[in-house]
């Protein structure tokens, strides 16, 4: 599997000829499945291959659970957290979350192999809150998103982190890690 980062909350996972894209920063990026963690409540129907709402989905062997973040959603915007199961691994995308999710939501994420976490503060989780969430969820790898620099998050985690252009991996490559931070360089 290949993991790439496109800035902000934009990530692509690819396994063979199948790809999943989360919060694409532009319309040029294409994938078989697109997840949106923040959408306008005026959106009536997502495009083909796009998932933008809470619910249970299965697309070409990828199992997706969308969990609505009602505490942060408004009459204009809906926020969704996704848990993705694919190739015997699980991936949790917290997207545009600002506050620490409820215990029920955190327990529902069930120790994902990779946690994608907003860490930049402001409209997103503070680095300190993000570190608390990461330590509670206990993923193998943590990939920060929505930040200017990862310094404050790395400090809160007590790590230096490892930086990569992209991550090429199989489950056996990451299951021995516990709570390791991976900083991905932006691919534009």
Task: Name each model-derived stretch.
Residues 111-145:
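A contiguous pocket-lining binding segment that forms or flanks enzyme active sites
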Residues 1-33, 40-42, 47-114, 122-128, ...:
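Core dinuclear metal-dependent hydrolase active-site scaffold
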Residues 46-49, 151-162:
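Short, aromatic/basic amphipathic alpha-helical patches
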Residues 146-150:
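Short beta-alpha junction loops
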Residues 38, 137, 157-160:
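Alpha-helix boundary/capping residues
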């Amino acid at each position: 599997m290949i993991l790439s980062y496109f800035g902000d909350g934009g990530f692509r996972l690819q396994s063979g000829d199948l790809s999943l894209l989360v919060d694409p920063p532009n319309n040029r990026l294409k994938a078989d499945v697109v997840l949106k963690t923040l959408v306008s409540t005026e959106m009536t129907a997502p495009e083909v291959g796009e998932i933008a709402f809470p619910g249970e989905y299965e697309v070409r062997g990828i199992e997706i659970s969308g969990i609505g973040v009602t505490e942060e959603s408004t009459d204009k915007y809906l926020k969704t957290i996704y848990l993705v199961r694919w190739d015997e691994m699980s991936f949790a995308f917290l997207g545009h979350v600002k506050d620490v999710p409820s215990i029920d939501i955190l327990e529902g994420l069930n120790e994902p192999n990779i946690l994608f976490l907003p860490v930049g503060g402001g409209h997103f989780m503070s680095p300190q809150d993000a570190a608390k969430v990461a330590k509670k969820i206990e993923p193998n790898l943590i990939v920060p998103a929505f930040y200017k620099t990862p310094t404050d998050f790395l400090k809160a985690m007590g790590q230096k982190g490892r930086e990569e252009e992209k991550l090429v991996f199989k489950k056996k490559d990451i299951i021995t890690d516990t709570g390791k931070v991976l900083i991905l360089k932006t691919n534009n």
